[in-house]
């Protein structure tokens, strides 16, 4: 999926489960969701954060390759993104991502 296509979907403000399902079906979606959280100035980043959080609850192992980037979001200037990561990262630990903290 292309970034602009995903942005269009996120602007629809569907339930986060809808966007998590996109990530389950197409693994190119997950890094795009993270990129949107890292770079997007508009409110669409919140939909991306909710989708990543849902993935961390249901299939956290899918996020392990992106652990460094997710930890980096703890330094976001946006408090909602920071708080979202505080809810997301424990799922990675449960999925065996304990080594992401040592990097």
Residue spans for each PLM region:
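Amphipathic alpha-helical scaffolding segments comprising HEAT/armadillo-like alpha-solenoid repeats
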Residues: 3, 24-37, 60-73, 95-103
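Ordered, amphipathic secondary-structure segments that act as subunit-interaction surfaces
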Residues: 78-99
């Amino acid at each position: 999926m292309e970034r602009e296509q995903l942005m269009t979907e996120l602007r629809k403000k569907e339930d986060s489960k809808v966007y998590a399902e996109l990530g389950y079906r197409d693994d190119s979606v997950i890094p795009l969701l993270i990129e949107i959280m890292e770079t997007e100035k508009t409110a669409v980043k919140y939909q991306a954060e909710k989708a990543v959080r849902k993935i961390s609850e249901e299939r956290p192992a899918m996020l392990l390759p992106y652990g460094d980037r997710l930890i980096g979001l703890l330094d976001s200037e946006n408090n909602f993104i920071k708080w979202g990561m505080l809810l997301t990262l424990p799922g990675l630990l449960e999925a065996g991502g304990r080594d992401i903290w040592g990097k």
